[in-house]
A protein has these predicted regions:
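Nucleotide-activated sugar donor-binding and catalytic core shared by glycosyltransferases
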Residues: 1-391
Length: 391
């Protein structure tokens, strides 16, 4: 193409916001700054110069019931997003996360202006649930950039060009300094440290805070010198801080911002984490982790009734390794007692922690692929603008 391309990036969750920002940096580098951006995103994309066209704070939604409850809000956001994209008239739109919202935005843009190239960055996990989404996506966008090397056949069967770029999560977390972290926060060198991560969605905080709090209460009784470290995610910061202040088991917990997360991981003996991108980040840092998740009960019942949950595991690390390197306690198993027992099994066995740490690092190294994922994604975006699908 000729001229300076305008690329519109859409991300509504914290992880997608970080992916969008990394992609923008790579596009800037590869074009020598000869690229313009607009979009919808959060703090990370704002730092790269994108003033979000809409407020994304209420759009990070997971599950059918949460989706129904937020239907009017999401419908209005979709309409506003499509209107802004058509007003800006970019050369391409890169849609990163939140399947229901981004799909409807893509469909709206395609219907109104087929000349705008549509690129999905990170596809829905059709290998795990609802394989029909592959055909839906293939009928809507021009190209898929996938972070999983086994994703492609599901989409290519429907004629969608797919490019495996690797997982950018694995490149953005730098090696931390656990010793310096302990010194900064007055944590003794030999004291056990548990990092607790509640999730980045409001619904995750609502469902996981209780079980995690009960687990931490049990663990603090079992390990009197246990230090609790809690990284705070931007979209849910106010809600989480308010809950922590009212829960005695978190008295004295160390709350850290994103800038200290790598050091916090390096200082941790183990982690208790809501399932999501952060589990991959913890694995990259070699932190033995227990992960957990709860869907709304109606959503869970429907998923089981219609056999929609196809995958053996829920975390990408376990799926990639085809082994439960990260213990998963989901739905009815996600109780304070069960979580405390699983974390305690890690805390009590230094040899097991060392073995798991090594296997987690080896697995995420394989997931990373060759080179830098954000650079490969940027190459694919530029190829699409030039009319190539890389096939």
């Amino acid at each position: 193409m000729t001229g300076t391309p305008l690329i519109y990036v859409v991300a509504v969750e914290r992880s997608g916001d970080l992916l969008g920002a990394a992609l923008m940096r790579s596009l800037q580098a590869k074009t020598g700054g000869e690229v313009r951006f607009a979009g919808i995103g959060g703090r990370a994309m704002a730092e790269e110069g994108v003033s979000s066209a809409i407020d994304i704070s209420d759009l990070a939604i997971f599950g059918w019931i949460d989706g129904l409850m937020a239907y009017k809000r999401v419908k209005a956001a979709v309409a506003a997003s499509v209107e802004d994209i058509l007003r800006v008239k970019p050369d391409a739109v890169v849609l990163i996360d939140s399947w229901g919202y981004t799909l409807r935005v893509a469909q709206g843009v395609r219907a109104a202006d087929p000349s705008i190239r549509l690129i999905k960055y990170v596809g829905p996990q059709v290998f795990a649930t609802r394989p029909g989404r592959a055909a839906t996506l293939a009928a809507t966008v021009d190209r898929l950039l996938t972070i999983l090397d086994f994703d492609a056949p599901y989409y290519e069967a429907h004629g969608l060009p797919v490019t495996f770029v690797g997982n950018p999560t694995l490149e953005r977390l730098e090696a931390g300094d656990g010793t310096a972290f302990r010194a900064r926060h007055a944590i003794p060198a030999g004291a056990p440290v548990l990092t607790v991560l509640f999730g980045s969605r409001t619904s995750e905080i609502r469902r996981m805070f209780g079980p995690f709090a009960r687990a931490v209460a049990r663990l603090r009784q079992r390990y009197p010198g246990l230090s609790i470290v809690i990284p705070i995610a931007d979209p849910v910061e106010a809600d989480l801080r308010a809950r922590l202040e009212n829960e005695r088991c978190f008295n004295g917990a160390v709350l850290v911002e994103e800038t200290e997360k790598a050091d916090a991981f390096a200082a941790a003996d183990a982690a208790l984490a809501c399932s999501g991108t952060v589990v991959t980040e913890l694995a990259t840092a070699g932190v033995p982790t227990v992960t957990s998740y709860r869907l709304g009960w109606i959503t869970w019942a429907l998923a089981r009734a219609f056999n929609l949950m196809k995958a053996k595991y829920i975390s990408l690390v376990n799926i990639s390794a085809d082994a439960e390197l990260v213990p998963e306690l989901v739905q009815t198993r996600a109780t304070g007692a069960n979580l405390a027992e699983a974390v305690g099994a890690l805390m009590d066995d230094a040899g097991r922690r060392e073995t798991l740490s090594r296997k987690l690092i080896e697995t995420t190294a394989r997931m990373r692929g060759d080179g830098k994922a954000s650079d490969r994604a940027a190459d694919a975006v530029l190829e699409t603008l030039d009319g190539s699908t890389g096939q």
